[in-house]
């Protein structure tokens, strides 16, 4: 009976039952759904249903905002590939750092609060980035390169707009609120850290994109991973 009460078994069962039911919805590719199932199983085992639910909400809203103005973005040649459906590289590129921190809560209880704050901030950063990118590409009136403030075309790596920047702030606040409501974080201080860190991480990703992405042929997924790793490093320094 202990096996059936095991959080990893519960997570595995719930994840793959839900994926079997909802996999026809065009939010992810087949590989994306499988990756989401593996991710969800580990998160449930490490952070119980709250950690799992927080990432489900992140994936849902990240996928939905990608669909906003998709026809327009496709006509402009700046839409996400595969009709906006998320593949394995998207799942792991955005979730790898958060997953690592979730796993660490099982092995280093003394720093569990720091790991949870880092976990929350990593997903706040990614939702902020998705909100900013997708809203900016559709509704941004003017786009500027973050490193020089020169006007550039929509969809340019490292490009920012007022509309996209405001959407990034909203995405970070929303994800921090979800983490607070689900008790991943528990204080107003941590809420502020997550919001600010999430937004600053989107700016850092824009800088990385502007300076290095095209020059060194970095994929969006690699830039995502670098962004969240830098974010955790800064959060850990703040908590020390």
Kindly label every feature range from the protein language model:
Residues 232-240:
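Single conserved hydrophobic/aromatic residue that forms the stacking wall/gate
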